UniProtKB/Swiss-Prot annotation:
Organism placement in taxonomy: Eukaryota, Metazoa, Chordata, Craniata, Vertebrata
Organism whose genome encodes this protein: Pongo abelii
Protein name per its UniProtKB record: Lon protease homolog 2, peroxisomal
SMART domains linked: AAA, LON
Lon N-terminal domain sequence ranges: 13-222
Short sequence motif named Microbody targeting signal, residue ranges: 850-852
Amino acid sequence: MSSVSPIQIPSRLPLLLTHEGVLLPGSTMRTSVDSARNLQLVRSRLLKGTSLQSTILGVIPNTPDPASDAQDLPPLHRIGTAALAVQVVGSNWPKPHYTLLITGLCRFQIVQVLKEKPYPIAEVEQLDRLEEFPSTCKMREELGELSEQFYKYAVQLVEMLDMSVPAVAKLRRLLDSLPREALPDILTSIIRTSNKEKLQILDAVSLEERFKMTIPLLVRQIEGLKLLQKTRKPKQDDDKRVIAIRPIRRITHISGTLEDEDEDEDNDDIVMLEKEIRTSSMPEQAHKVCVKEIKRLKKMPQSMPEYALTRNYLELMVELPWNKSTTDRLDIRAARILLDNDHYAMEKLKKRVLEYLVVRQLKNNLKGPILCFVGPPGVGKTSVGRLVAKTLGREFHRIALGGVCDQSDIRGHRRTYVGSMPGRIINGLKTVGVNNPVFLLDEVDKLGKSLQGDPAAALLEVLDPEQNHNFTDHYLNVAFDLSRVLFIATANTTATIPAALLDRMEIIQVPGYTQEEKIEIAHRHLIPKQLEQHGLTPQQIQIPQVTTLDIITRYTREAGVRSLDRKLGAICRAVAVKVAEGQHKEAKLDRSDVTEREGCREHILEDEKPESISDTTDLALPPEMPILIDFHALKDILGPPMYEMEVSQRLSQPGVAIGLAWTPLGGEIMFVEASRMDGEGQLTLTGQLGDVMKESAHLAISWLRSNAKKYQLTNAFGSFDLLDNTDIHLHFPAGAVTKDGPSAGVTIVTCLASLFSERLVRSDVAMTGEITLRGLVLPVGGIKDKVLAAHRAGLKQVIIPRRNEKDLEGIPGNVRQDLSFVTASCLDEVLNAAFDGGFTVKTRPGLLNSKL
């Protein structure tokens, strides 16, 4: 057996460490390069080298974690493959990454690693040669039988395939043209074998051993094809083509070698995907689209970018819950108990949820209503939505809409775009796996708007019970039924929600909590939760209700309970430190007692008198349990109080009045201050005021000027023209906060009346209401939140418009008992209630008109 042109590899080779795939002599493989050592090798040898020798590498398979950048070189496999780098493809952005196309030349054995950094270089010993033999070359006698047997099985395997496939025809020609010594490595790299089996073939240096190990692999492949042909009934010649391509996906002849892309697993996935599509319960339209796409997918090469897009699309279509749903639990009594146990107060909201459950019990095919909980932060809107899902026994999914400004987030991106994906609605359905979950659309009032569209407009179809049974996501491009989904939205205010979207939702107001409700919530839910989170027990800490009230009034001013929860958490952390220190000191004291007793025995034996032992006076005794949290402890833990009852001090001079304002965070009290000085009759307004509030100020001064004689109001010069040589400055404190709205009109009038009459406004009175130029008081919104704010501030009387009297029914009974309400229809009634002794009309004597 003579060789014509043997290949001699260098005695020193740079080593390329791989962990995916095994390169055999005569085969071609693509491998990714992303580890630091391999990147240095590519840059130094392949990108900068110009000689043929610089393109020859030593490929070491089965390297554990070659991508690791550890300092030490990982254990190396004993035998590798000398390879020729045929192609280098890659880039340095966003991070360096290269792909190598390498062709195996021969086996080698590592003799000694000469260098490890920046990439390993080893002294190697060539084990075999890839040589070209003439076609008339005879095999050695001892290998003749094995060679003939191997050749017979190889020909049988190829003839079972479709010879019309170019790759199969090329393989048949290679069996006759290539030397028999090269066939075991080449066929092993083509047929379906595991990396472990390929590694065993690589380690088989003896040609006889390679023949013996490869023949069973060929037999196994032949039996598998026979079984596949029996189980499949060929309808067309295309079926045979599919069978042929399955075991041999891609065969390329490069310098007498073959390439196997090892894509069998992907092909099996396509078969399973097709089976799932045919057995799925998706609608007819969606099924037709999927069948069409799977046919296109079969014809695509996997290298096409559209292949991955189409496959991802089909996998999503199969995973969507077209007809899968959960059974509702409609036990009204259990639902009522669950709602009462988990949420204190909130009677109106719980009543509406129970009404929905009752109607569902009476009529199963009820279209899901669109509920919108509107209220300040921290009152439990999101947790109620989660509780509704728990009560019904449905899956729950939260979609955060705050800051979303692209309508594609709702409807999805069209598949023509790179990186396209379905919208949040379809993604949520895929996540929960059922078609009747509870979807919580959180912060729907904070949707944005941009050049990419208006997501609020995209929600119109989602939240319309008359349309959402035919919701079409841009990514799916087929209709999906959302009518069984229960949508619950949350918002802090309805002012920023578009009118069309607001019309599709049932608004349920969730007001803030009263002080009594906060105390009850703290002791029912917040304190036990904080104790559990901090590893404390009720025997270690005691927080009386008086302390809780101090936290609410002096350290938090909010409609919800989030700040209260944080303050309780701070208290528990401080107590946890004390408890841990006490346990440490107890253990230290115990050790000191033992040492003291042992030391006493020794000294008594020596002197019959105990000497001084280790001093334990520096060890403070552990705190007594439970630790009581009082006002002094609050001051030590939380610092000085953040809020004080300063209402009476701030109303100690004329020209100050208290109004009531509504914000998305709940109700607040609002001071209005006025002063006058010599000037040219100008009105100055400060405090970040909106246009509506500025107009209210002008209305107030105009009404007072027109009624100055009626109330005997004069400026500093005794003129009834209040702006004659007089400037007025109106200020609304908290200047960093934007303020607007008409409800401050009565407060501005009262403040100016106090200024010009030089009388003090009652310090326990707050007011709200819009005014007109005729002196009428018009109704305003947010009465409940405003009244609760007045109650939190310790006020005793609230002046509201008469037409808002109906809103007092929604105020808790204990708040109504603590406050007195004055309903006013005109400014005369407001002024009479705001000042001690009233604000009566003054008439000058002698101005009696007689008709006699």
